[in-house]
């Protein structure tokens, strides 16, 4: 793991190399690149010295044998001389046809894929459960079947093995409780 300070020093080192390469290209008669404002690079020491209350800048420590694996890219893009900046900055996802239009991979709807998976494992999904025989004859036991795909670990909240959302959540499902046995209040009578 590379420390934040070492990462900042390595980023500073890369910027210094870039500016040195840009200056060399300008001195050799090649196209000179504009100097980028690099926040961590001190072009000249301050004539007044360090600010009061601030420690003077330490020289960079020698590099150790540690390596950065997958370091995040710099926020400012510094291009080397000879690289063209005309590349498109918009990432293209998905395969393209010769006409340049994107091809969408066919996706099955969630409800269809769930139904097909459920039909394939129908025999394994139904588990017989004996619910309180209450002294009945064992030969006359009736088995109640429920699908084991719903977790019953949330008892007593999932007593019917029907989740309100989560497993087969759909955005247009209305999860509010409706009471059909209560007649609506007659507001005219209440106000009088």
UniProtKB/Swiss-Prot annotation:
Q: Which PANTHER family match?
A: RIKEN CDNA 1700001C19 GENE
Record region (Disordered): 24-108
Q: Does the keyword Isomerase apply?
A: no
Q: Which family does it belong to?
A: Belongs to the CIMIP3-like family.
Report whether Cytoplasm shows up as a keyword of the record.
yes
- List the biased-composition ranges (Basic residues): 55-64
Species annotation: Bos taurus (Bovine)
Keywords on record: Cell projection, Cilium, Cytoplasm, Cytoskeleton, Flagellum
Protein name stated in the entry: Ciliary microtubule inner protein 3
- Check the record and name the InterPro entries matching this protein: CIMIP3-like
